[in-house]
Regions:
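Domain-level recognition of nuclease-like catalytic cores that cleave nucleotide substrates
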Residues: 217-261
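Conserved helix-loop functional segments at active or binding sites
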Residues: 139, 143, 206, 210-214
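Conserved catalytic cores of phosphodiester-cleaving nucleases, focusing on short active-site segments
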Residues: 137, 166-176, 181-194, 204-206, ...
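Residues at alpha-helix caps and immediate loop-helix transition turns in enzyme cores, especially N-
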Residues: 166, 199-203, 235
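Conserved nucleotide-binding/hydrolysis micro-motifs of P-loop NTPases
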Residues: 76, 90, 192-194, 229-232
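Acidic/glycine-enriched edge-of-secondary-structure segments
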Residues: 153-162, 187-201
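Accessory nucleic acid-recognition modules appended to NTPase machines
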Residues: 1-167
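Arginine/glycine-rich "motif VI" loop of SF2 helicases in the C-terminal RecA-like domain
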Residues: 178-180, 209-220
Length: 261
């Protein structure tokens, strides 16, 4: 946030390189701002930008081609996807710097940061932490979830009985087999700035039950909580009693994933 450092302008330079030759540059910037603000579905982006979803196909495709925007399929809902910004520096710029650029240039970084800290945690750190957890889960040894992971992703499960939806941040599937139901090795929830409790395990257990009803094999599914803050005593006690409950802390994500845990 210091105008005197090279990194202060880096995000603006990166974006300028990508959109200088493009028409309607403001729309491209608006699309990125929408995703950075947490609108990660096509409909959500369209609502934020004030355009029809069909009108944004070209802009989304261009950002995907540059590699700055990544489209990830919902692993539980065919044809549904969500977008994320691939470069955390761009997310930081859109969430923290760009809205208060004038104040930053005037040297009021402390004021800007005080106002932006909560948004930074929710819209930059949170999504990036989820991505790190999925990358970690993709590389773990077979003894973590009972088999080497196949596909790893995220998805939403409709809970009609409770009139809600359950977001699964880290869904780990066994490698595809020729026959039989698709086996889920782990269902996980990731929280950067919140102490996790038994409520998070209960939600994952409910998700496993719903998926079993949809034909998935959840007989050996691990329920995994990933936290950047920690876990309360009750959930730690539950994990000590039940080997199918895994608690992954920030330090665990940086342990070599070669099975030497």
């Amino acid at each position: 946030l210091d105008p005197g450092t090279p990194l202060f302008l880096e995000a603006r330079y990166l974006l300028a390189e990508e959109v200088t030759a493009l028409r309607e540059a403001s729309i491209y910037h608006s699309v990125l701002a929408a995703v950075a603000a947490g609108n990660n579905t096509r409909g959500g982006i369209a609502s934020h930008v004030g355009r029809k979803a069909s009108d944004l196909t070209h802009y989304l495709n261009v950002w995907e081609d540059t590699g700055l925007l990544v489209r990830e399929e919902d692993v539980f809902r065919s044809g549904r996807s969500r977008y994320r910004i691939a470069e955390p520096l761009i997310s930081f710029y859109e969430v923290v710097s760009r809205p208060q650029w004038g104040r930053l240039e005037a040297g009021h970084a402390e004021t800007v940061w005080a106002d932006a800290k909560a948004r930074f945690a929710a819209q930059v750190l949170g999504p990036h932490f989820e991505t790190l957890c999925r990358r970690w889960a993709q590389l773990v040894a077979a003894d973590m979830f009972g088999a080497l992971p196949g596909e790893v992703g995220a998805g939403v499960i409709a809970d009609a009985a409770n009139r809600t939806q359950i977001q699964v941040d880290v869904a780990v599937f066994a490698p595809a087999e020729r026959s039989g139901p698709r086996r889920i090795l782990s269902l996980g929830e990731a929280k950067w700035g919140k102490t996790m409790t038994l409520a998070h395990i209960d939600r994952l257990r409910r998700a496993a039950h719903l998926l079993e009803g949809r034909g998935y094999d959840t007989s050996t599914t691990r329920l995994t909580c990933y936290s950047g803050t920690g876990f309360d005593e009750d959930i730690r006690a539950a994990a000590a009693r039940d080997a199918r409950i895994h608690l992954i802390e920030l330090a665990d994500l940086y342990v070599p994933v070669d099975g030497s845990r």
